[in-house]
A protein has these predicted regions:
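Acidic, surface-exposed loops and disordered segments
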Residues: 1-117
């Protein structure tokens, strides 16, 4: 309860770099998040280059902290891995529906929440 009651939103960020080692550890720890059917319907786009951050800014609602951050993480609902898995087994993926979108969005949100905690 202490963690929940002390939650806050931060809008001012440090420009201190995040090491590859720390980032890798956090991403790996978040992989333990339960997902729908253990399909892990998410991906994380890691962006450090200025040009990449500029191009991704609209997806982050052009928030100024995106271009100023040393690293930007974009958490995405993603069927790519599961689609390839199905196709390699001569199966039709069948994710073109709202329920699949909700499952993937939920997986991405849960992964992101675990990463941030």
């Amino acid at each position: 309860m202490k963690t929940i009651n002390s939650r806050r939103t931060i809008r001012k960020y440090s420009r201190k770099d995040v090491s590859e080692g720390l980032l890798k550890t956090l991403l790996e720890q978040a992989e333990h998040t339960p997902t729908m059917g253990n399909l892990q319907l998410y991906s994380v786009v890691i962006t450090r280059k200025e040009e990449g951050k500029r191009r991704l800014a609209p997806a982050h609602f052009n928030q100024p902290m995106v271009e100023g951050a040393p690293v930007v993480l974009t958490f995405c609902a993603d069927f790519r891995r599961t689609t390839l898995w199905a196709e390699n087994r001569n199966a039709t993926p069948g994710y073109d529906n709202f329920l699949s979108f909700l499952n993937a969005a939920t997986d991405a949100l849960l992964y992101c929440q675990t990463f941030c905690n």
